Curated annotation (Swiss-Prot):
NCBIfam families: rpmF_bact. One of its GO terms (cellular component) is large ribosomal subunit. Keywords: Ribonucleoprotein, Ribosomal protein. Belongs to the bacterial ribosomal protein bL32 family. This is Large ribosomal subunit protein bL32. Residues 49-60 have a biased composition (Basic residues). It comes from Nitrosomonas eutropha (strain DSM 101675 / C91 / Nm57). SUPFAM superfamilies: Zn-binding ribosomal proteins. InterPro entries: Ribosomal_bL32, Ribosomal_bL32_bact, Ribosomal_zn-bd. Pfam families: Ribosomal_L32p. GO terms for biological process: translation. Residues 1-60 are annotated as: Disordered.
């Protein structure tokens, strides 16, 4: 089992953890419906970049 040779200082510990922070997911607003969705994903209504790409249950 690996054991550290020297104790890591609080500064080095903080530097190691600097990339662990959580970030908000990148959201986009669909121009036709105004709904928010993940970037590069289809909105819940089936729109992508202003065009209808799939049929949903609510469609006639």
């Amino acid at each position: 089992m690996a054991v550290q040779q020297n104790k890591k200082s609080p500064s080095k510990r903080g530097m190691h953890r600097s990339h662990d922070a959580l970030t908000n997911p990148p959201l986009a607003i669909e121009p036709t419906t105004g709904e928010t969705h993940l970037r590069h994903h289809i909105s819940p209504n089936g729109f992508y970049r202003g065009k209808k790409v799939i049929k949903t249950k609510n469609d006639d």
